[in-house]
Amino acid sequence: MAGYQLWSPWTPLDESFQWLRHTTPTPSSKHPFKASPCFPHTPSDLEVQLCFQEVTLVLDSPFLESGVSPKLPCHTSELRTMNNKGLVRKPQPIRLSGVDSVFGRVITAQPPKWTGTFRVSDKSAFCKIISREHQWPIGLKEPQIQMTVTMCKQMLRSILLLYATYKKCTFALQHSK
């Protein structure tokens, strides 16, 4: 299964976002969503993997260790600020190698395609929402069932439109100069 990530491989547009993912430049691939094999693993990747193995792990960012100079110029005092309650760190995004790292098993990362009937594969994340064994609650009348199905179709269409827009925007941002 091809990997998918929340952040595209390195592009010149990322110069101002280096603090977000603590990475060094890597060549960008042609496809904005496929993971690059040379993309470095971040501490948050390991944290996500161990989280679903029920292992607790606390990782400090290598850029925050004392006595070590930051690799990038933007990793200075802006990376951490002090307030009355203690240390505040900027959040690190998590790169996913597929939806399996979220759900704990191998499933398809793409949403189901609309073919006129709603079919869901056993390995799809959507099988948790609608399954073949799903039974309608007793007492629903036909108009209520039709209204519920219509609402589900509209929500699925909205999700698919948002997903397509996200893909197009990411692709356009990666390839703009």
Curated annotation (Swiss-Prot):
State the InterPro entries in the record: FANCD2OS
Give the matching Pfam families. Answer: FANCD2OS (PF15124)
PANTHER family reported in the protein's UniProt record: FANCD2 OPPOSITE STRAND PROTEIN (PTHR31036:SF0)
Protein name per its UniProtKB record = FANCD2 opposite strand protein
